[in-house]
């Protein structure tokens, strides 16, 4: 009885030991015929790479780039952009308040101020680097050229340009307090937006346009009419500083108005209650974005590269990649050799390969 009991105990332990394996990786393999067996192998082929200079790329984007950055290997990289300003369909300026009809809102039929605001949210490089930005008015309509080798000189006269303004700036504006920078509206959205602002002549870009809209309302019928007859766009570039490139989200042309504070129930201006100003009509000032760069209008970026990339591309010891426009790496694969060797094989997986500073002649096994 003891021997039988001991034998049963050993058998149970053995079954328990071999029965605890939960690996199902080979489950069912034994049921397959021998001809269905899968064998894995790797092979290698010689790959030749070379650098190709790319002077431009197609860039259909609503982001503008402005600034300059110098790299010790690739040399300098300079970015600027040109953009039209969108005019909403059947645009109309605010009207002067009519006390008889109780319509309109402005205190006078004038524009109190005009400014061009370049908004950005991110940048590349040194946030405290001193830079200077210039804005020029375009004198010729932009073509639908989305390539980064666009020549701005075709659209404004470099010898006799219309300069809208110059402003010194740093990407991170240290004059803005933390309270301003972190302020939010009633919905929790931040109200501060980094920007570079150019003050424009209110007569040329404000009151003249206001008068023109009354004489030729068809000029403000849509963006096409506005660009053809009123304002063709702006060219934004950096002409001082090295080490910072701004990623511009949009460009706004804003106008300042003085208006009456109207009681919405009666459509009559509120009366002031301050001592010395009793019973005077209550007024205020506001800035409004009237025209802006949007996806509906043309925006084109120009990227300029140092001549250093020509020397790097000619080097035969390495290949390089410099984007978005600069140097591409071209890899020549031995297609015929691959086809002949793998014609009867099934490729279940191909491991992707990335190239960075490769030697001109390498095999996949070296990567």
Segments predicted by a language model, with ranges:
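Bacterial N-terminal signal peptides that target proteins for export
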Residues: 1-7
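Proprotein-processing/basic-patch segments
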Residues: 23-28, 199-309, 322, 352-355
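Conserved small/polar residues in nucleotide/adenosyl-binding loops
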Residues: 356-364
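C-terminal motif of bacterial Sec signal peptides marking the signal peptidase cleavage site
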Residues: 17-19
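Acidic/polar, low-complexity intrinsically disordered N-terminal segments immediately downstream
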Residues: 23-113, 118-125, 134, 139-146, ...
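Sec-dependent N-terminal signal peptides
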Residues: 7-13
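Extended extracellular/luminal ectodomain segments enriched in beta-structured repeat modules
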Residues: 108-113, 342-349
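Internal, well-ordered domain-core segments that constitute the primary functional module
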Residues: 118-222
């Amino acid at each position: 009885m003891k021997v039988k009991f001991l034998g049963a105990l050993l058998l149970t332990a053995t079954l328990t030991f071999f029965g605890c394996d939960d690996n199902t990786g080979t489950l069912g393999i034994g049921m397959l015929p021998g001809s269905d067996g899968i064998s894995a192998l790797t092979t290698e082929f010689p790959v030749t790479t070379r650098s190709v200079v790319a002077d431009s790329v197609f860039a259909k984007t609503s982001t503008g780039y402005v600034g300059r950055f110098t790299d010790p290997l690739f040399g300098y990289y300079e970015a600027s952009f040109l953009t039209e300003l969108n005019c909403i369909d059947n645009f109309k300026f605010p009207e002067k308040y009519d006390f008889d009809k109780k319509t309109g809102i402005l205190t006078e039929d004038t524009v109190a101020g005009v400014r061009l605001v370049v908004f950005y949210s991110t940048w590349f490089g040194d946030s405290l680097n001193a830079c200077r930005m210039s804005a020029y008015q375009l004198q010729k309509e932009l073509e639908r050229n989305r390539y980064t080798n666009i020549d701005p000189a075709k659209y404004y006269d470099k010898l006799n340009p219309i300069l809208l303004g110059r402003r010194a700036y740093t990407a991170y504006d240290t004059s803005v307090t933390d309270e301003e920078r972190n302020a939010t509206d009633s919905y929790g959205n931040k109200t501060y937006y980094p920007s570079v602002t150019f003050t424009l002549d209110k007569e040329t870009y404000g009151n003249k346009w206001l008068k023109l809209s009354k004489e030729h309302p068809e000029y403000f019928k849509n963006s096409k009419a506005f660009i053809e007859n009123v304002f063709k766009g702006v060219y934004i570039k950096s002409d001082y500083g090295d080490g910072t490139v701004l990623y511009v989200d949009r460009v706004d042309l804003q106008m300042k108005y003085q208006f009456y504070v109207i009681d919405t129930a009666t459509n009559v201006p509120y009366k002031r209650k301050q001592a010395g100003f009793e019973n005077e009509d209550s007024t205020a000032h506001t800035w409004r974005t009237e025209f802006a760069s949007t996806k509906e209008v043309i925006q084109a970026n120009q990227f300029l590269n140092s001549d250093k990339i020509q020397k790097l591309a000619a080097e035969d010891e390495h290949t390089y990649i410099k984007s978005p426009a600069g140097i591409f790496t071209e890899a020549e694969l031995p297609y015929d050799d691959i086809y002949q060797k793998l014609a009867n094989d099934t490729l279940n997986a191909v491991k992707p390969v990335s190239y960075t500073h490769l030697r001109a002649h390498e095999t996949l096994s070296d990567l």
